């Protein structure tokens, strides 16, 4: 399943379940320092890259993602469904660049 497939499923579920008052949203988190992530080779370099290149110049924490999830589950987000919320310090807004890319 591709990321586009997954995003389409959120939208389809939101459309199908909205009339029952069920909201469906997703969270796309940036790299997070976790026990599981420590098993990824050179993960510290991924974190460093993200910190240097994300607009907010910081990495995402587990608390950041939890706060976004709590918001989406709360009454404050009653009008939000079928969305993917990026919790990545803005990295998704600048896109991926590679060494040698010309500006």
Predicted regions and their residues:
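Conserved catalytic helix of short-chain dehydrogenase/reductases
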Residues: 1-16
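C-terminal helical subdomain
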Residues: 7-8, 26, 45-80, 89
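Alpha-helical segment proximal to the catalytic Tyr-Lys
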Residues: 15-19, 78
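Short, conserved catalytic or interaction motifs in soluble domains
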Residues: 19, 29, 74
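Rossmann-like NAD(H)/NADP(H) cofactor-binding core
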Residues: 20, 25, 83
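Short C-terminal tail/terminal secondary-structure segment
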Residues: 81-103
């Amino acid at each position: 399943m591709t990321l586009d497939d997954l995003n389409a499923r959120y939208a389809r579920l939101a459309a199908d379940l909205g009339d029952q008052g069920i909201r469906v949203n997703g969270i796309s988190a940036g790299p997070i320092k976790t026990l599981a992530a420590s098993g990824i080779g050179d993960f510290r370099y991924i974190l460093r890259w993200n910190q240097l290149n994300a607009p907010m110049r910081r990495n995402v924490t587990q608390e950041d993602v939890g706060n976004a999830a709590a918001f989406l589950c709360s009454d404050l987000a009653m009008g939000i469904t079928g969305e993917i919320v990026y919790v990545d310090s803005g990295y998704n807004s600048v896109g991926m660049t590679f060494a040698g890319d010309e500006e």
